[in-house]
């Protein structure tokens, strides 16, 4: 049986409430069957599910929220979007190996609530907030590791058998410990913060109720129980803090971006002034700046199998945009928008990324191609900038 049932009685300051936590594997057929049995036997006054508004809508309508790709490009949220796709793709592939759709046990809980006229409560944090906080907290090394995993993922990496899936549910602490070791940041944002968020939501919902059932992933059960006990003992959890995308960090990031850009501009202008009396040196500096920033940015577009017109635009714009510290003026944004103009993006492209079985399939997907063009053109220009700066500093030395 791929399921965990934990019962905890909580005094919420108003009354005592029995909370039954059903910990499931989100891709297990057994989970669906057991959810109905447990809910029927417990007869709760409400059912809570590990969903937010967006995922609830997607689950009950089988429709995905439309992606505003222009907004993704203009805001530079390429990696955040990639991570969302990785999570969706991974869960879907694992589910397919067991002949079950991800989230089916949540859908079953919703159907049971409707059948018995019970209120349904969405207790998880908004997925966009979770991913934004993850991006703010992750180090550059962690972000690059995820991007590398995307490019090198293999279908075999996602293969699970029944024994392993049972072990994941019965002993989630082993896998939580492994996640902590791989990336403490991912564990804290994707697991621990959401444990706190859902525990607080359940604690508040339990007021004036005798019993509740909550259907959550097995990896969240112990954390939710732990935080429910802390809440019972007077240790409050600030939900506003957990949904805040820290602007202070964004300001610091923006300040750092401006600082790096101003340093680059200062070195570049100093080299221009230094070479004013030496026309040959001035030509060489200008030529190298255009060649390496523009050339490597255009190469990034071509490596992403972008359009020739996009590569030309990247070549012409990179020498200028690398000196402008604005996201909207970044060569990746410009290249991505140009590529988007020549590639029709449909809902099938989003579904295609999630369903992709290989890198070849991804590279034939228009949506993925646009995002890759934006990412690699930015990367190429950045490599060109630092190569030129190294050469310029060498001249001064």
From Swiss-Prot:
First-listed, main subcellular location of the protein, grouped into a coarse class: membrane
Highest taxon of source: Archaea
Places the protein is found: Cell membrane
InterPro entries: TraB/PrgY/GumN_fam, TraB_bac, TraB_PrgY-like
Signal peptide residue numbers: none
Transmembrane segments: 255-275, 284-304, 308-328, 370-390
Keyword Transmembrane helix: yes
Membrane topology type: Multi-pass membrane protein
Protein's name according to its UniProt entry: Uncharacterized protein MJ1365
Organism expressing this protein natively: Methanocaldococcus jannaschii (strain ATCC 43067 / DSM 2661 / JAL-1 / JCM 10045 / NBRC 100440) (Methanococcus jannaschii)
């Amino acid at each position: 049986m791929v399921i965990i049932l934990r019962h905890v009685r909580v005094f919420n300051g108003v009354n005592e409430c029995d909370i039954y936590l059903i910990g499931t594997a989100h891709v297990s057929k057994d989970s669906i069957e057991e959810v109905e049995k447990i809910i029927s036997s417990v007869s709760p006054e409400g059912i809570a599910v590990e969903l937010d508004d967006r995922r609830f809508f997607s689950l009950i309508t089988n429709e995905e929220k439309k992606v505003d790709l222009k907004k993704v490009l203009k805001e530079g949220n390429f990696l955040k979007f990639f991570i969302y796709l990785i999570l969706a793709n991974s869960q879907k592939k694992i589910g397919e190996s067991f002949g079950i759709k991800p989230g089916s046990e949540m859908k079953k809980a919703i159907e049971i609530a409707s059948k018995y006229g019970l209120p349904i409560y969405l207790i998880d944090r908004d997925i966009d907030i979770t991913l934004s906080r993850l991006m703010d907290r992750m180090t550059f090394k962690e972000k690059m590791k995820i991007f590398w995993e995307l490019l090198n993922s293999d279908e075999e990496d996602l293969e699970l058998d029944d024994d392993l899936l049972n072990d994941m549910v019965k002993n989630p602490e082993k896998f939580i410990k492994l996640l902590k070791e791989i990336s403490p940041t991912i564990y804290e944002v994707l697991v621990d913060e959401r444990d706190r968020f859902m525990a607080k939501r359940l604690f508040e919902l339990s007021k004036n109720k005798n019993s509740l059932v909550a259907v959550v992933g097995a990896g969240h059960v112990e954390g939710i129980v732990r935080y429910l006990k802390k809440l019972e003992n007077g240790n409050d959890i600030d939900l506003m803090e957990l949904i805040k995308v820290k602007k202070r960090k964004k300001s610091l990031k923006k300040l750092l971006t401006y600082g790096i850009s101003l340093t680059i501009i200062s070195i570049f202008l100093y080299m221009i002034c230094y070479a004013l009396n030496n026309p040959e040196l001035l030509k060489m500096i200008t030529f190298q700046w255009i060649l390496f920033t523009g050339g490597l940015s255009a190469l990034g577009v071509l490596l992403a199998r972008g359009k020739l017109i996009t590569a030309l635009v990247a070549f012409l714009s990179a020498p200028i945009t690398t000196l402008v510290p604005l996201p909207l003026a970044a060569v990746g944004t410009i290249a991505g928008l140009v590529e988007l103009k020549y590639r029709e993006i449909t809902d099938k492209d989003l579904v295609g990324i999630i369903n992709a079985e290989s890198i070849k399939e991804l590279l034939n997907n228009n949506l993925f191609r646009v995002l890759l063009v934006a990412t690699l053109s930015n990367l190429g220009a950045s490599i060109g900038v630092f190569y030129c700066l190294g050469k310029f500093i060498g001249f001064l030395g």
